[in-house]
Amino acid sequence: DNLICDSSYNLGKRTHNGLSEYGREVVKEMNRVGVMVDISHVSDDAFYQVMDVTQVPAIASHSSCRHFTPDWERNMDDDMIKRLAENGGVVQINFASYFVDQASKDTKAPIDADVAKYIKDNNLDPTDYASYDEYRREQYDKRFLYVSSEKVADHIDHVVNLVGIDHVGFGSDFDGVGY
């Protein structure tokens, strides 16, 4: 969570139950000055509250369809995609394997847990990425389920079938997700 809204990654107690009052003002100001509101990373409650506040189309710059990853709040469910389309917005499909395929997502958590254990067992600083990157890469190369472009296309087709081609785009997240 931050000062603006709750995060989809915070699975514990949410700070604002969606948007904070400050967040509502931020959305209004973004509308006023012509800045697009990006709802990737926000909690479901924050998403719907942004949709209620914004007067211009919003985007999900790098999200995918929860239809294929049911327990992944970071992705959008069908009702959210419909609401975003009603707003004139676009969902830009994230290419990361664990965003587009549940089986891939299921391989990620055990690897991440093993990497965390490696960091702890070797007294490494978790913020010193270089100190454990080689180990992390080895683990992902051996154990992670990478998916094909067909899985990404399934998400695109799902959005097109749900709300039309005008409301889907590409949002690779390649600068932050390499698998």
State what each model feature region is.
Residues 1, 35, 40-47, 63-66, ...:
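Active-site beta-loop-alpha junctions enriched in small/polar residues
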Residues 3-15, 26-33, 59, 64-65, ...:
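Active-site-proximal beta-alpha loop/turn segments in soluble metabolic enzymes
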Residues 10-59, 73-89, 150-166:
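Histidine/acidic residue-rich metal-binding segments in metalloenzymes
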Residues 50, 70-72, 102-104:
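Short, well-ordered secondary-structure micro-motifs
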Residues 77-135:
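Aromatic-lined glycan-binding groove of carbohydrate-active enzymes
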Residues 90, 94-96, 140-149, 159-162:
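Extended C-terminal subregions enriched in glycine
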Residues 93-98, 163-179:
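Short acidic/histidine-rich active-site segments
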Residues 128-154:
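Intrinsically disordered, low-complexity acidic Ser/Thr-rich regulatory segments
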